Every structure is written in C-alpha cells, then in structure tokens.
Amino acid sequence: MSIISTLLGKSKRGGKTSPAAQRLVRNMRYELVPLKSLDQAIADLPKGAAVSVTCSPAKGIATTQQLCEQLLEKGHNVVPHFAARLVEGPEHAAKLAAWVREKGIKEVFIIGGDAEVPPHYQYALPFMKDFLEAQPGVDTIGFGAYPDGHATISKGDLHN
C-alpha cells in the first residue's frame, strides 16, 4: 500500500487519517526532474496527478515541453517550469506562450535559471513580461524567491 493511499485513509490497518492531512495529500503536487529514473517516476504517479516539470540547463526547455506533453497525454495536470536564462528572446517567449495556450495549461512556474550565459534574458521578470504580452491564457504564475539569499546569486541580482 502506498503512503498516499495510507494518508488518504485507505489503509488496510484500519487507521484513520485526519481530514486536514487528507486534504494536504489530495492537493499535493509532484515534481519531476528529467533524470534516468524518469520513466519509473511517471509510472508511479497516481492517476490525474498535478506535476511540476523542472527545466534544467543541461536538458533545456524543449525537454520540459516534451515531458509535459507526455504527462498531459496520460491525463496529468502539468506545471511547466521555464528558466528565463534559457529563453532565446521575445519570439521564443511568444512561442512558449502559444504552446501553453494550445495545450490548455493554466499554470506555469518562471525562474531566472542557472544557465551561465543567457542568450537574452538575465532575469525572470523581463521574460515574464514578454510571455504575458503574448497572452498564454494562464491563471497562475509561480516564481522563485529567495528571502534568505541564494548560494550563487548576489543580493543585487536577486532584487532584479
């Protein structure tokens, strides 16, 4: 029996789970990283799971999009992460917005990203502006914030 089933109160042991814990588990979101164990991770997802799909500098945005499409085909609700430092410019931002709109994705997560040499966007905010101008049709945009600082980003850059 999975921990999710147990927390949802479906334990064979007959134990009760509090309604608050059950709500938390029902609303949880999984995060997938494109690693070697990805196929198994996808297979282990519960039906209709909400899944955040990360965007790594090594794999790129196209991999994030491909993984999102694969998950959408399996009936999952996806939240693609877009790293601004991997976006090539306003045209690319508009293409991403069109893709999000076409796929019916209602939430995205935008970060600055870790790519060392950005092709166009140094920070998340300029990309976010271009992305929104292209009318992606999203209801929610998540973004990264580091109130306690970041190991590799200066305080000045964090304020941008």
Residue locations for each model-derived region?
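Active-site beta->alpha loop and helix N-cap motifs at the rims of alpha/beta catalytic domains
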Residues: S2-N160
